[in-house]
């Protein structure tokens, strides 16, 4: 039974009437462009075929009822006429409540909804299960009540909910790719203008995601430290964001910066340039150049931004040794664990799977999880 069938069946069983709509919003993987989003830079993600699915129907009152199928059918119920506050003992509820609260501030022309939510985006793997949920909930209200909101506004609304209501700092990339993803394409996103350009993926290329299953512990505190270091760098150059600093300008005065801040700035500037070049390499089907850029990106995250861990570096080395120059591999996501992403010819997938299975656990004591994904469509009815 797929997620659509599962949520529709549960909806009818619990609420006693059929759902009118089923909405999906995908998770994502970022091919290149790491920690560039909050510096107003470029990212190159694609939506993946793992998603949050919500079966839903409008109500004729002002109540929102939510069932979380993946959490033993836990229930959340709240009124649109009372202040929406956090639900401290049920964390998933806060993503729903935050989205609805921020939607009210954007466009209050909607009423109550019944919904049943289920998803298969791996959690805690850096594949944006939370953004997928936020965009799915926003799309539910937009579709049921014909709200005049486009994908970018639904994405911004989800980001606001996560930053201000849930209390987790994040850039705009995760929500934007979930809302705007295009089948068989990656999107080159300008995080300043929110402009997105579809970049076709070469035929016969697989997007492989391997979760290191190394438990991320530092991610929150270190993420915020990296943001502060980048802001310090932008202030040094008297620019609103590192997006506005050229590598030439940086190289001329790098020795005057705090050495750690200088390394952080160099990563962001070089990563931005790599990301723009990667989009054109991908468009041309130049997997060899894409592989070089991904390797440079990983080295920069390891040495300049210092967000990889030995387990992730081991995974990257195993994959790289298997594929040579036929494609690329790098850490993806916030860092300190999580996943690596590889772009490889489909016929190399079995060899990569085998090499990782034979070597990763032997070297680290941790068993990986292996996903082969397709670049998928963004949020909408399913």
From Swiss-Prot:
Any matching Pfam family: GHMP_kinases_C
Binding site for substrate: 34-37, 223
Record Gene3D superfamilies: 3.30.230.10, GHMP kinase, C-terminal domain (3.30.70.890)
SUPFAM superfamilies, per database record: GHMP Kinase, C-terminal domain, Ribosomal protein S5 domain 2-like
GO terms under biological process: galactose metabolic process
Keywords: ATP-binding, Carbohydrate metabolism, Cytoplasm, Galactose metabolism, Kinase, Magnesium, Metal-binding, Nucleotide-binding, Transferase
Family annotation (InterPro entries): Galactokinase, Galactokinase_bac, Galactokinase_CS, GalKase_N, GHMP_kinase_C_dom, GHMP_kinase_C_sf, GHMP_kinase_N_dom, GHMP_knse_ATP-bd_CS
Catalytic activity: alpha-D-galactose + ATP = alpha-D-galactose 1-phosphate + ADP + H(+)
PROSITE patterns: GALACTOKINASE, GHMP_KINASES_ATP
Binding positions (Mg(2+)): 130, 162
Binding site for ATP: 124-130
The protein's annotated pathway: Carbohydrate metabolism; galactose metabolism
Protein's cellular compartments: Cytoplasm
Protein's UniProt keywords contain Metal-binding: yes
The family this protein is said to belong to: Belongs to the GHMP kinase family. GalK subfamily.
UniProt function note: Catalyzes the transfer of the gamma-phosphate of ATP to D-galactose to form alpha-D-galactose-1-phosphate (Gal-1-P).
Name assigned to this protein: Galactokinase
Annotated source species: Salmonella paratyphi B (strain ATCC BAA-1250 / SPB7)
Gene that this polypeptide is encoded by: galK
């Amino acid at each position: 039974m797929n997620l659509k069938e599962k949520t529709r069946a549960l909806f009818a069983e619990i609420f006693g009437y059929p759902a009118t709509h089923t909405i999906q919003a995908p998770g994502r993987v970022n091919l290149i462009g790491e920690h560039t989003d909050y510096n107003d830079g470029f990212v190159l993600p694609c939506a993946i075929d793992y998603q949050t699915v919500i079966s839903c129907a409008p109500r004729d009152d002002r109540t929102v009822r939510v069932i979380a199928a993946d959490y033993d059918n836990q229930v959340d119920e709240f009124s649109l006429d009372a202040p929406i506050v956090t639900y401290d003992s049920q964390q998933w509820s806060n993503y729903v409540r935050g989205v609805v609260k921020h939607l009210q501030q954007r466009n209050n022309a909607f009423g109550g909804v019944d919904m049943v939510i289920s998803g298969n985006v791996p959690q805690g793997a850096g594949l944006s299960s939370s953004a997928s949920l936020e965009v799915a909930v926003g799309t539910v209200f937009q579709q049921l009540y014909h709200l005049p909101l486009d994908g970018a506004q639904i994405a911004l609304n989800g980001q606001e909910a996560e930053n201000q209501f849930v209390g987790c700092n994040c850039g705009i990339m995760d929500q934007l790719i979930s809302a705007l993803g295009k089948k068989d394409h990656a999107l080159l996103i300008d995080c300043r203008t929110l402009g997105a350009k579809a970049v076709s993926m070469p035929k016969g290329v697989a997007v492989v995601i391997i979760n290191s299953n190394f438990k991320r512990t530092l991610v929150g505190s270190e993420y915020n430290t990296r943001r502060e270091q980048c802001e310090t760098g932008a202030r040094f150059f008297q620019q609103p964001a590192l997006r506005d600093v050229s590598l030439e300008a940086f190289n001329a005065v790098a020795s005057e910066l705090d050495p750690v801040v200088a390394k952080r700035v160099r990563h962001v500037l070089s990563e931005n340039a790599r990301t723009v070049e990667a989009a054109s390499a991908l468009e041309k089907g130049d997997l060899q150049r894409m592989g070089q850029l991904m390797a440079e990106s990983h080295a920069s995250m390891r040495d300049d931004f210092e967000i990889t861990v030995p387990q992730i570096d081991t995974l990257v080395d195993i994959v790289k040794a298997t594929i040579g120059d036929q494609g690329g591999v790098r850490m993806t996501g916030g860092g300190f664990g999580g996943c690596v992403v590889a772009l490889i010819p489909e016929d190399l997938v079995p060899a990569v799977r085998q090499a990782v299975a034979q070597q990763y656990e032997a070297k680290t004591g941790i068993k990986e999880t292996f996903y082969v994904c397709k670049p998928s469509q963004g949020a909408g009815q399913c």
